[in-house]
Amino acid sequence: MDFQHRPGGKTGSGGVASSSESNRDRRERLRQLALETIDINKDPYFMKNHLGSYECKLCLTLHNNEGSYLAHTQGKKHQTNLARRAAKEAKEAPAQPAPEKVKVEVKKFVKIGRPGYKVTKQRDSEMGQQSLLFQIDYPEIAEGIMPRHRFMSAYEQRIEPPDRRWQYLLMAAEPYETIAFKVPSREIDKAEGKFWTHWNRETKQFFLQFHFKMEKPPAPPSLPAGPPGVKRPPPPLMNGLPPRPPLPESLPPPPPGGLPLPPMPPTGPAPSGPPGPPQLPPPAPGVHPPAPVVHPPASGVHPPAPGVHPPAPGVHPPAPGVHPPTSGVHPPAPGVHPPAPGVHPPAPGVHPPAPGVHPPAPGVHPPPSAGVHPQAPGVHPAAPAVHPQAPGVHPPAPGMHPQAPGVHPQPPGVHPSAPGVHPQPPGVHPSNPGVHPPTPMPPMLRPPLPSEGPGNIPPPPPTN
C-alpha cells in the first residue's frame, strides 16, 4: 500500500488514516473516558460469556469489547429499558411507611406550686440604661436540677391575646410550676456585664439581670435650678483657668445728642491698688454740673499720690495732659473759639462771660476738666518730647510735659492745678470751664479767704 502518494500526504510522514482507523481510535478514547467515570464491574447488567464477548442482560445484546458495551449503556435503547425496569419495580414493591418523627418525652412530675419571686427595677446612673433584676426562691428544688430561663414572644404563648408590645421571660425548675414575667418588647443588651445569671446552691435562690438597649443617646446632665436668692456653685475649672464671664444680653442704648458711648466696664480681675475717688455720672445734655466745694487742707500740704515721685524742692511738674503755653500767650478756655483774623481781642483783664454761664460763688472751685486746650492762631503746640532733667530732679510722671521757658514753678506747699486747668494769679479763684476769671480786686476790697486767719490779713496800704 502506497502511503507516500496519497492526496494530503506529506513526504517523510505517515499517510492519512482511513475512516475505519479513525473510528477505532475514537471508540478507544471514549472507552477510556467512560472507565474513568463508570465502574464497569459494579454494573448489574454487564456479563462476560464463555466466548470472551460481553453481553447486556437488560437488553440481551452482544458486544465484542468493553468500549462497545459502554457505548451501548449511553444509548437510547438501554436508557429506555432502565426506565421501564424502574417503573415495574416501583409498582411491585410494597408501600413502605414514612419515617416517624422523633418524639420528645415530656417529664411528668407532681408540681408543688409557684416559687417566690422579687423584681427590682434599676437605672444606670452613668449611661441611663434601664434594667430588671429577678430573684426567684426555690427552697424545695429537686436534686441536681438547675433553674432555666428563656424569652418567649407574644405569638408563642396561648394564655393572653398576642401583643407585639410585650414579651415574656419564663423561669422553670422542677418540681415548681413554670412562671413567666411580662416585660416590654425591647431589644435586650447582651453585652458583657449587662446580662448575667447566678444560682446560689446554698440559699436556693436564682438571680437574673438584663439591661434594655438605649433607644436615644443620654442627654447631658443639667444642674437643678435652686430656690431664688441662692447662688449656684461655681463651675469646675477648665485647664486650671476659670471660665469667661457671661456676655451682657444687650448693649446699653446710645446716649442722646450724638455723645460718645461710655466705656465698657472691664471684664478682667480688678486691679490691685487703692480705690480712686467716686465718679459722678455724666450730666444730661444742656445741664451744667454743680461746682464741687473744695475745703482747704489743714496743713496746706498733701501727700503725693501712690506711684508718683515727689518733685525736688522748688521744682513742680506741670499738670498731666497740659501742654506748656508759649511765653506771653494764654490759651483760650475750653468751649471758647479763638478770634478770627482781623478781630481785636477784648481789653486785657476784662473777659466777658459765656452766654448762659453765671460766675461762680466765692469759695467754690470748679471741677477739673481733662483734655488738651486748643492753641491760639499762629501758636504751635510743644512737640511731645522729654527733656533731660537736672541732677537730683525726678522725671515727671507719664503723660506730663515739661514747662516752657518763662513759666515759673509754683512755690512749695502749693499743689499743681488739675488736668486742663491753667494756674491763676494769687487771690483769684478759677471759674467754671469756658468762663474767664474776673478782674482781680484791690487788696482792701476783696473778702478774706478762709485759709487766711485773723492774723493773716495784710496791712492796709499807706495813705498819703
Swiss-Prot record:
Keywords associated with the record: Acetylation, Metal-binding, mRNA processing, mRNA splicing, Nucleus, Phosphoprotein, Repeat, Spliceosome, Zinc, Zinc-finger
Q: Which residues form a coiled coil?
A: none
GO MF, one term, reads: zinc ion binding
Which InterPro entries does the UniProt entry name for this protein?
Matrin/U1-C_Znf_C2H2, Matrin/U1-like-C_Znf_C2H2, SF3A2, SF3A2_dom, Znf_C2H2_sf, Znf_C2H2_type
Cellular location(s): Nucleus
Q: Provide the residue span(s) of the region labelled Disordered.
A: 1-27, 217-464
Which PANTHER family does UniProt cross-reference here? SPLICING FACTOR 3A SUBUNIT 2
The protein's name in its UniProt record: Splicing factor 3A subunit 2
Q: Which organism is the protein's source?
A: Homo sapiens (Human)
